A protein has these predicted regions:
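C-terminal interaction surface of TIR/SEFIR-family domains
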Residues: 4-7, 11-100, 165-289
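Acidic/glycine-enriched connector segments
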Residues: 1-3, 278-378
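Conserved BB-loop
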Residues: 1, 38, 93-123, 137-143, ...
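Alpha-helical scaffold elements adjacent to nucleotide-binding pockets in ATP/GTP-utilizing enzyme cores
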Residues: 47-54, 93-94, 121, 147-151, ...
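Conserved beta-strand-loop-alpha-helix hinge of the TIR/SEFIR fold
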Residues: 1-20, 83, 123-170, 249-267, ...
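Short glycine-centered, acidic/aromatic-flanked micro-motifs in structured strand/loop junctions
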Residues: 78-81, 107-109, 135-136, 296, ...
């Protein structure tokens, strides 16, 4: 196994003996994840958290040879209301857990250097962090909570909302929407399982956010997206669109999936064209004169570790192919039976969903019955 700048490895020690592999060879001097230290009930969550964090570090951070890991770790900004106990106590528990791992953190005034302005320091940290908004009953009504959300949105930072309402909030802050949300119990102390769920969602959203941005920027560099098009990593929001339009942008590209026409209708009033790479109105009729056949075989029998091909891969491929061919007015031809969870059913489901999404009847699927006929054993 030869490692390089483009082929990296994160070794995992199943037991203490596994650490011995770090004394020589390609794994020499590499730090191992120690799975034997993870408690039994939470082992799966800890594994996901640890591996997702390494994917973030090696995928989106420039790591120097002498980097000890801490400076390339994800930075998390815990945003919470001080009023009431739920938000504050949940934030303290998350803070304590983060402090025991290799994730840098920023936690209210505890990280603000003496002599620095409070608001300037908060904004500075938000600009380089993933914001975790701990939504207690008082959260949406607090001035600084609103400012922290708006600052994160302004600087296109990843955001996770944590729903821990005890009773209710009288008004949900509009800018706090359009982001992933994790629900946890308002009871204190928050469980380690819920902390792990929050942190896993935080890291996965950070990876998604950064990957989407880099992917769209690459598409733009290849002229698949116009150079005068703004790139954003979430579906567009009215405050953001107004700012972009004021800066001269009339076109906006955001990641898949595209918004339903009813949700995106307000964009037409601002005369802004917002689209995803595969859902551009300019290509709506690109395949109107084509009848396109799809032929997909079953995946090899066996487990994932042997063939490195999960059964879901082919299902998703058939869905994606059908979705984008149909969206461009193509007629999809497929030969198959309508067995439960079969590829034909998946393609028909996509056609039905697409009719609703595009609000049109111009969706065509031709299914030619396969021979021999499929007969269920049951």
């Amino acid at each position: 196994l030869s490692l390089s700048d483009t082929f990296l490895a994160v070794p995992i020690a199943i037991d203490r003996n596994g650490l011995g592999h770090g004394s020589e060879g390609s794994l020499k001097n590499l730090n191992f994840l120690r799975s034997y230290e993870w408690s039994g009930d939470l082992k799966e969550q800890r594994a996901i958290l640890a591996m997702a964090h390494e994917i973030y570090r090696y995928g989106f951070v420039e790591i120097c040879e002498n980097d000890h890991g801490k400076c390339s770790s994800i930075k998390i900004f815990l945003s919470h209301a001080k009023a009431g106990d739920t938000g504050r106590l949940h934030a303290e528990s998350i803070y304590q857990f983060i402090d025991s791992t290799n994730m840098s953190r920023f936690f209210d005034a505890t990280e603000i250097s003496p002599g620095f302005k409070f608001d300037e320091e908060i904004i500075k940290h938000i600009k380089e962090s993933t914001l975790v908004a701990i939504g207690s009953d008082a959260y949406s009504s607090r001035y600084w909570c609103q400012r922290e959300i708006l600052c994160a949105k302004q600087h296109q930072r990843p955001i996770i909302a944590v729903d821990c309402l005890h009773d209710f909030e009288d008004r949900v802050f509009p800018a706090g929407s359009n982001v992933p949300c994790v629900h946890v119990s308002p009871d204190t102390p928050i469980s380690q399982s819920d902390i792990l769920r929050i942190l896993i969602a935080t890291i996965l959203e950070t990876i998604r956010h950064l990957h989407a941005k880099k992917s769209l920027e690459y598409y733009q560099s290849q002229n698949w997206i116009d150079n005068d098009c703004a790139i954003i990593s979430r579906p567009p929001e009215i405050r953001q669109v107004i700012d972009l339009k004021n800066s001269g942008k009339q076109k906006i590209c955001y990641p898949e999936p595209s918004l339903y026409s009813e949700e995106a209708g307000w964009l037409s009033h601002l005369e802004v064209d917002a689209f995803t790479p595969l859902w551009n109105k300019a290509e709506d009729g690109a395949f109107s004169s084509f009848r396109i056949g799809i032929s997909i075989s079953d995946n090899p029998v066996g487990n994932y570790s042997e063939h490195h091909l999960h059964a879901d891969h082919l299902k998703r491929l058939s869905q994606d192919l059908a979705r984008h061919l149909l969206a461009r007015a193509g007629t999809v031809i497929y030969g198959g039976d309508l067995r439960k969870d079969g590829f034909t059913q998946f393609i028909l489901d996509e056609a039905i969903a697409l009719k609703t999404r595009l609000n049109t009847d111009n969706i065509h699927v031709e299914n030619h019955l396969a021979w021999p006929l499929y007969v269920s054993d049951s």
